[in-house]
Amino acid sequence: HSEKKLLAVIRKELQEIAEEFADERRTTIEKADESPLEVEEEAAAPEEVIVAFTGAGQLKRINPALYKKTPLPTRAEDDKEFADFLFMAKTDETLLIFTDHGNCYPLPVASLNEVKPKERGQLLSGVLAGLEDDEKALWMTCIRMADVGHLPDILFITRQGMVKRTAAADYDVRSKKFAAVNVKDGDRLLTVLPAASRDDLLLFTRSGLCIRFSLDSVPVQGRVAAGVRCMQVEDGDEVIWCGQLQDSDQIVLLTDRGYAKRLLSVDFEKQNRNGKGVKSFYFNKNG
């Protein structure tokens, strides 16, 4: 009998609980969703491509197999289709394009249209936002942005004799266009080049003056600096060429009248930066 009494007590307590907490079910039972789970796709593996910038000012992204069958012509064959810059690149890399207005334009390789070697490429004006009508590319390199800091320092030389040296890491900028160097009014950027393991810089002006000075005398400055003076350029003259030099190098000078001479690098005496330079060529009335 005690068992019956116990069951009666339990039944009574359960009824009291049910009455006290009686309300609608707060959760719903729904049919299982059998649609497949959407899994985020992994990024495609980087693809190897050829990137070329031609004498006609066109960028081309080419399949390496097609390029092997039909390479671009040499400069002697076709200076318009000759590649002024040619890279074996990957689609996860970025072109850093430096212009004579002192700007840098990062351009993802993956954004370029793939074309056949003989097909028309893309003009810079069509792929670089903010490019001025008279703005021209001087130098470019292709690299993963995470690796920019591994590049050597970058040198900027202007027509009025300014030089700036900046660590490549300063150009890891996430923007479609940014200032690479502060070019003063009335001046124009002439050359951009990586600071190779060469000892000196050699500059020539239109009037035949030249100066050779140590690369170590050029301080490393920030990205938007204007640089330091490397040569005192006279009024009416301008720097027309700059390169890096070692004692084992030879230099060939050519004039617009067809005169030429070859010199050893040791013939160019090293001077202090910011000098007036010395005559490398004496012009007579015939050129």
Regions found by a protein language model. Name each.
Residues H1-G287:
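C-terminal interaction appendages of subunits in large macromolecular complexes
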